[in-house]
A protein has these predicted regions:
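Short boundary segments that mark the start of a structured unit
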Residues: 1-346
Length: 346
């Protein structure tokens, strides 16, 4: 016989459920890696634990790589890596190292969040200043969208200290294409400033020539030193030119100071006389630049073709004399040689 009477069943729910036990904590750690293609397997030890490296370095202009990894209570990477963390850039806590400047020495804007288990990079910036090695920190915070039950960031392994390596300052260091900042005497074009000299290539006898010395970058832009920089220019007579022709002596060294104006100047005064000597020549050449330690590489022995107007380390100037003549009109105000004769010429 079938009982057709209705039956009422009540399912009782626990409004204060017991806390689940035996749940393993998941920690998120930050690891420095060597390249963008590094996998978690590459940084796993033979016993299955994660190899945690909390420092890295790159030459100025290079890239630094990092990865946030989820690990179990034994420090072993989980099979599933997921979630998002925020990237924070900071300074080193000790005074022993020099801090890099965010936005100037490295790009702190490209990566501000990252996926757990995915490599991210920070690009450093190359320049011509000799700043020494500089440090900054990369730290993960604010874990979100995590698939794990009890995840948290391991605050003992949440930070990597990164170092940007810089070249030591030098004069006429070797410039190579794609050169990076290392401890060797090899420099890239971004590391180098060039000392150049400009001035008139002709002057009439009795005239004065002003020469300008300055520092420029690889594109010809003026570089203004924060420290006064002395450039040595050597004056040399050519051919029959002698000390009677200018106010300089042969092989005289001239100290030219480049200041906050971005340039230094000096003059050569030519002497007017009555001898018809034909044209005479002299040369002024950069022969040394003071190493103030401000720039990585100051170069004056060669120049790249990226600098406009054919830069040079020397100028040869021709002193133009009057052609010998008889009974030519004399300018009582003091003619400068060329087409007018002065009392000194007559």
């Amino acid at each position: 016989v079938t009982n057709t009477d209705p039956v009422t069943t009540t399912i009782k729910d626990n409004t204060t459920p017991n806390t689940e036990t035996n749940v393993e904590d998941v920690k998120i750690v930050l690891v420095a890696v060597s390249s963008a293609t590094t996998t978690i397997a590459d940084i796993t030890n033979s016993d299955g634990t994660l190899k945690v490296t909390n420092t890295n370095e790159t030459p100025e202009g290079g890239k630094l790589y990092y990865i946030a990894v989820a690990v179990d209570k034994d420090g072993k990477p989980l099979a599933t890596q997921d979630g998002d963390v925020t990237i924070n850039y900071g300074t080193t806590p000790t005074a022993s190292g020099k801090d890099a400047t965010a936005g100037v020495d490295y790009d702190n804007t490209t990566t501000i969040t990252t996926k757990v288990g995915v490599v991210f990079e920070v690009e450093t910036k190359d320049d011509y200043y000799a700043e020494g090695d500089e440090n900054f920190t990369v730290k993960i915070t604010d874990l979100k969208n995590s698939p794990y039950e009890t995840p948290s960031i391991d605050t003992t392994k949440d930070t990597v200290t990164s170092t940007i390596k810089d070249n030591a300052p030098t004069i006429n260091g070797t410039v190579v294409s794609g050169g990076e900042d290392t401890n060797s005497n090899t420099y890239g074009s971004e590391d180098t400033v060039y000392a150049i000299i400009t001035g008139e290539t002709t002057v009439n006898e009795g005239g004065v020539v002003t020469y300008t010395v300055k520092l420029v970058d690889k594109d010809g832009n003026t570089v203004i030193p924060t420290k006064e920089t002395t450039v040595t220019v050597t004056y040399t007579n050519i051919g029959t030119t002698s000390t009677d022709d200018t106010n300089k002596t042969n092989n005289q060294e001239i100290a030219v100071k480049i200041d906050a104006s971005g340039k230094g100047t000096f003059t050569v005064e030519t002497k007017d006389d009555y001898y018809a000597e034909a044209d005479e020549n002299y040369n002024v050449k950069i022969t040394n630049v003071q190493n103030t330690g401000e720039f990585e590489n100051v170069k004056f022995d060669s120049y790249p073709n990226t600098i406009p107007n054919s830069p040079s380390n020397n100028v040869t100037t021709t002193i133009v004399d009057n052609v010998a003549t008889n009974n030519h009109e004399v300018d009582s105000d003091g003619g400068v040689d060329g087409t007018v004769y002065g009392k000194e010429d007559t």
